[in-house]
């Protein structure tokens, strides 16, 4: 039997760029953060975008009855959603009014979350810093940073904490009930009884401290984890633009503040203000509690009653209510500045514009849903009016990240934003926006275009999401926070039916909506942004002046106290915590993951085909891969662009508008991805393949294969104007937001110094790809690019270099195979070409990508052994141990970076990284001193830390898999169920002696093949401070 699903989740990151026409990105705020090892998390999607299409059934036996009380919780509402076999129970604790929403569902991935409505009244980042501090120790668990320590004492599939613009949530999920109860205790104690220690405030929030804490003569600077995090956030232009849009469209409101914290305002926060805020806003009366899955909810109710709520009483929480924004009588225009992005386009085009409209109250569920659909009709794909009028004229780099409909705030918003346009085109954009609204109001929409949007929504609801409980939580949080009806919000099929009926009865239904919400809406903000070459200098000067103002208020005694406090904090950070106070799973608590359905390998018309018969909710998933290793170097470098544009160019029989309409009416789209796959057995070779991924309802499978055949046989690259627009949008898209994923780009940059396969990865996915595309487009005419892509298309889709995979239901499998055979009959065959290349390893090297940002992203990569080597599981355990015991304490807690860690990829690249880091060479030195630290702290590697590190690996290995992705590891890497089980068994058998041997073998002497990389500001002393020669990429 073959196993599918884990390896692809943790292999070296390979970003696959998609043009924004394929999906809408909701209006985000800078104020949504992830509190795990540093990676920024996007705001949850609209509550209308999750997988449920329910039907309510009245008569059935329920576990809890309406009107009855269980452990102090009265059951107020019970509803069954039959299509997803879940039952919703709404409870309210009688003493405090705390609402608990339990979703009972036969799903092994159980979820729990405590939510609070936390409305900021300034931009000091108080709710965000409190989120960090709450997880730094509590009454029952007085351990420094139990949250991070629990990461490796649990097999949680998800652990997090997030601050939104008006809420803070603390969610986790796990498939193990003992783990679930352990984490419930940790989270509940953290939020209701946190220690809120002053020195944790200094570490996580902000502090004034000597730059060198051991030198009292060194200058005073501002430090702090959140402070550095927000410096990083405010250096990202997309974040700055989104945050200002939120602040300015709600100017009289809590949303005018930055809940995450403006770095120049954070140092105004006083510790006592944070303590008082917790008392008020983290009161149980202001809490909402969510649980999901198959674990017994009565145990949760009993725990809350007995340990946290019974000694509390109700308080009026109206102080946290979010009122509606008062509507404007006149539209407004706001202009802001941003940093010059040296990764971006030319300075004259580094401008952005957004036109935003305030829509309806988010709690008006049907109205909000219909506006969401209308928004998709207006902006989605080449058949939408805004795409036709704003994107296709090609005076910008396409939609920006704010575009779309958002229901994440009390009043919903609709935004159309463009990036990379000239200042003189701002006026043109506004005029086109107005004209498009008027024309849409007068002319209406093509009925097939509307139907394609609704079909795509209905198809998305059929997906079986392995993280359904988390998805439901995130998509309900904002609505629930505004006291909206989250249960009725699950009735998406009813909302779709209601909309269809309204449209059938009134052909101008959408046109009337446009008149009301778009044409006659004075609450309209036009936000523009342009680069300022002095932006970073101005920030540095403002930061310097802020420090100077604070220093002026200090006498010598206070300065001495700051120095002494820094030493005390250093000792506090180095002190050992009694982690025995924290719960931890034992090996007896760890269960084997479920075995996945058998994979059948068949030869279908000489094409190796993998078939998995599994319940898929009436969807058939199809993947096929074409080996393209034989392409030339230039053709290979063009493959990411090829994958991005191929389904947007049209075919011999359909122009691009017609083809897009057919795709959306019959399938979930065609996703082309480029895969560089190393041999996981010996790392001596690699191959390149392009994978096509699509899915459709079973009754649309014939059309799915027909459209796929049409695309790969008849794609046209003869429309040079169309391609020019797509290329410019693509370059804008990949150039924006490099810093937000800076640690990933840094790891790719470091890996590119290790071997030629790593160098190719950087050319295909990294900063080097951005540079290549800019230079290539500058030196090559669009007509020539058309010819090159057309040549690639004639080479890529070779049946002799193909393999396929089908996941479908057992009953539909014969029909799926029959349609697949017809698809294969027409594919061209022109003999096998080169299928692999040998890997060559390089001499050690270091490089920096210079970015004008105030933080760094550092990485070091070295070659070890690949996935199926016997030492790989040991090194993976070691990576977890180093992250928890060395890198996070030193680089995050002590030195102030937002995140740090170590990981090993399937090809054997062992990487160290930091995220939003105030340091560069100091961090690289910490990476280099790993062996020295391990030898000096051998006592750290004990049985408990070893076991905890294994649990951290199990979290990744045992992650649930969607039915459509079962078998993916075998399809990509030929890692079988037996291989996986052997790997898992070897990992669990790793001993302390194994770790010590691995330390000596792979870190005891400097690796022959390693690379270092920094993304960050200029450092004139880089070579002097590191004693290495550096390649500087400006």
Curated annotation (Swiss-Prot):
Its main location: mitochondrion. Keywords: Hydrolase, Metal-binding, Metalloprotease, Mitochondrion, Protease, Transit peptide, Zinc. The active site is at residue 131. SMART domains: M16C_associated. Belongs to the peptidase M16 family. PreP subfamily. Homodimer. This is Presequence protease, mitochondrial. The lineage of its organism: Eukaryota, Metazoa, Ecdysozoa, Arthropoda, Hexapoda.
